[in-house]
Amino acid sequence: MLARFSSSEGLFLIQAQLTDNSWLLYPEVRLTGGFAFATWWLGPNAGQFVLTLGGYHPSFQRDGYPIVARLGLQWRVSNAIVIKGGSYFALTSEALMAGVEVEVSADFGFAWARIAFGANAIVYFDPFYFMADAYARISAGVKIKTFLGTIRISISLGARIEVEGPDFRGKATIEVGPCDIKVKFGSSREIRGIFVGWDEFV
């Protein structure tokens, strides 16, 4: 754990991270990730704060904010089956965000399969704006040995949806192998933010 107070920089920071030896119930279930709280009263980030478990939304980047590893879990059920997951939550002076992702994979040599799903969402306060996305994918394959050589057969299916507002609109995508079908929905107008302060939002 790290705690830092600097009157010259106008910064108060608390940050912690799980070690490489962190596990849940038994050693095969590994845990990763970190936590941070910071507030500034001087400098370019004066008046801002951040509280995060596991980091930030993929599109959210701010200079000077603490870098925090995703909260994650990796469970090696057996030599062939692995379950991995990650998540984050963050509240800052300008936005609220959260997300999760999970992947289950199995590899038996002659056959394999993977299932993955996840979601991300972020809401900005001023101007008011939100965006969110969710996805799911499944893929599988087999290897067949013949007198002519090894034949590999695989298939993959996926779906993804993205939305944003306040002029609600979005896009849905269906993926079948290398092909995809995209459908747009909602407003076609340019999104204009509605100014909402932190006090009004909460």
Across the structure, where does each feature detected by a protein language model lie?
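Extended assembly/interaction regions that build large supramolecular complexes
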Residues: M1-V202
